[in-house]
Amino acid sequence: MKWGVVAVLATLVVAASAKDYFKETFDGSWADRWTKSSWKVSDGSAGEFKLTAGKWYGDAEADKGIQTGPDSKFFAISAPLATVFDNTGKDTVVQFSVKHEQDLDCGGGYIKVVPATSEKQMGEFGGDTPYSIMFGPDICGYSTRKVHVILTYKGKNYLIKKDIKAETDQLTHVYTLVIKPDNTYQVLIDLKEVASGSLYEDWDMLPPKTIKDPKASKPEDWDEREEIADPEDKKPEGWDDIPATIADKDAKKPEDWDDEEDGTWEPPMIPNPEYKGEWKAKMIKNPAYKGIWVAPDIDNPDYVHDDKLYNFKDLKFVGFELWQVKSGSIFDNILVTDDLEAAKKFAEDTWGKHKDEEKAMFDKVKKEEDEKKAKDAPPPPVDAEAAEEEDDEYEDKEEPSGMGSIKIPKEEEESGHDEL
């Protein structure tokens, strides 16, 4: 009983210590908290975000998010965190949901977390605005269907080296990124882990610990030949006396051959089946073989260990900066926190509560769309040539019975039956 009380208290302490730096579920006042960027507005290529639950959803109000539109536009919008997030010694959890309702064929669906140092640029927040974290799905055709995890280190952006597959259907999915003070990370989709590992191993933020010695050179006596000619092998006697071609003994002088006019007839030459080509000694394993020479590793003088790769001290904004050929993605339920369990609970209370109803409505809408397409579809085209061939098999015959014109197969008419 005591242990149970302790466990409950521990859970409460953890919950109490967790902090949400940003939480957005997109109600009717969402536009008061978000700033549309002026990026791309002047040239007319900037798109808009509108509040909607889309064509299918679990709850018409709770599932409202912001949707991109129209097609082939750039989209940029941002909002400030409640307070600047210094993640020193804390987990960093970035979570949001996205529904590619339009069956996205090419476009981004990722979120950016932006540092306070970019504050003066947020009015024109766009592709060149420095950010700290970029996370989420990116889809373009069949070649690009990945989850980006890009981290900024000392002013440079580094892409994750792992290939994480993005969800590509038309339903809502929750993407969660966790960065920990021990320099490890997790990526979850729909609260299931799809990737994890080390910031040191899965990004190239630091140079390698060791490098090949640039001053090293291959020793002169280093033998890289895996095989050598057998020094004991000898060329058979008479090998070089065998000609490459010989006269064709089966050839016959043509009957019309005139030696005086055509010259002395000689049979044509053909390849000699006994000829074996240039003699070469057989190859044997080289007893002196040492393998391919590789320069030895040495400590990299440029390597400096950093135990704070995870560390972002001034996270201040979240934003979407996207290009979409086919618009219609709906973003919702954004959370920046320092506690994964709090993020999971938030996802369960939002997406998790309505996902089954959304799927059911999606199936219903798709079924109705398919039925309408089938109903509105034009009849299959008539093969005019085939129809004409069929008609040619018959001829009109007038019968005295008063039944009018009937068609009788040609072959029956031409068979010449006598009337009884």
UniProtKB/Swiss-Prot annotation:
Gene Ontology biological-process entries: protein folding
Keywords: Calcium, Chaperone, Disulfide bond, Endoplasmic reticulum, Lectin, Metal-binding, Repeat, Signal, Zinc
GO cellular component: endoplasmic reticulum lumen
Biased composition (Acidic residues): 221-230, 385-398, 411-420
Spans annotated as 3 X approximate repeats: 263-301
Biased composition, class Basic and acidic residues, residue ranges: 210-220, 357-376
Annotated GO MF terms: calcium ion binding; carbohydrate binding; unfolded protein binding
Compartments where found: Endoplasmic reticulum lumen
Protein family: Belongs to the calreticulin family.
Protein name: Calreticulin
Organism: Chlamydomonas reinhardtii
Lineage start: Eukaryota, Viridiplantae, Chlorophyta, core chlorophytes, Chlorophyceae
